[in-house]
Amino acid sequence: MAQRTRLGDILRPLNSEYGKVVPGWGTTPVMGVFMALFLVFLLIILQIYNSSLILEGFSVDWAG
């Protein structure tokens, strides 16, 4: 028999919804927000790599 934990009791309602499809948009807007934030993060990393984003006191030397 499985042991009950507080974390398991907290997560159980999420697991009970497994396989069910909620009508409408659901959490799609939240996913869109996180995708946009991830895109901004990638753009910042690309600009640092490309040296087009200049950070004071931070030198990027890729030669090793």
From Swiss-Prot:
InterPro entries: PSII_PsbH (IPR001056), PSII_PsbH_sf (IPR036863)
Chain ranges passing through the membrane: 28-50
GO MF annotations, alphabetized: phosphate ion binding
Top-level taxon of the source organism: Bacteria
NCBIfam families hit by this protein: PRK02624.1 (NF002728)
Record's subunit section: PSII is composed of 1 copy each of membrane proteins PsbA, PsbB, PsbC, PsbD, PsbE, PsbF, PsbH, PsbI, PsbJ, PsbK, PsbL, PsbM, PsbT, PsbX, PsbY, PsbZ, Psb30/Ycf12, peripheral proteins PsbO, CyanoQ (PsbQ), PsbU, PsbV and a large number of cofactors. It forms dimeric complexes.
GO biological process, one term: protein stabilization
Knockout-associated phenotype: Reduced growth under photoautotrophic conditions and increased photosensitivity; approximately normal amounts of PSII accumulate but electron flow from QA to QB is impaired. Increased photodamage to D1, which is degraded slower. HliB no longer associates with PSII complexes. Psb34 no longer associates with PSII complexes.
Thylakoid found in the keyword field: yes
PTMs per UniProt: Phosphorylated in vitro in the presence or absence of light; phosphorylation is inhibited by oxidizing conditions, DCMU and zinc ions.
Major subcellular site: membrane
Keywords on record: Membrane, Photosynthesis, Photosystem II, Thylakoid, Transmembrane, Transmembrane helix
Function field: One of the components of the core complex of photosystem II (PSII), required for its stability and/or assembly. May regulate electron transport between the quinone binding sites of the reaction center. PSII is a light-driven water:plastoquinone oxidoreductase that uses light energy to abstract electrons from H(2)O, generating O(2) and a proton gradient subsequently used for ATP formation. It consists of a core antenna complex that captures photons, and an electron transfer chain that converts photonic excitation into a charge separation. Required for association of HliB and Psb34 with PSII.
SUPFAM superfamilies: Photosystem II 10 kDa phosphoprotein PsbH (SSF161025)
UniProt key word Transmembrane: yes
Gene3D superfamilies, per the entry: Photosystem II reaction center protein H
Family indicated by similarity: Belongs to the PsbH family.
Cellular-component GO terms for this entry: plasma membrane-derived thylakoid membrane; plasma membrane-derived thylakoid photosystem II
Pfam families attached to this UniProt entry: PsbH (PF00737)
Membrane topology: Single-pass membrane protein
Official protein name in the record: Photosystem II reaction center protein H
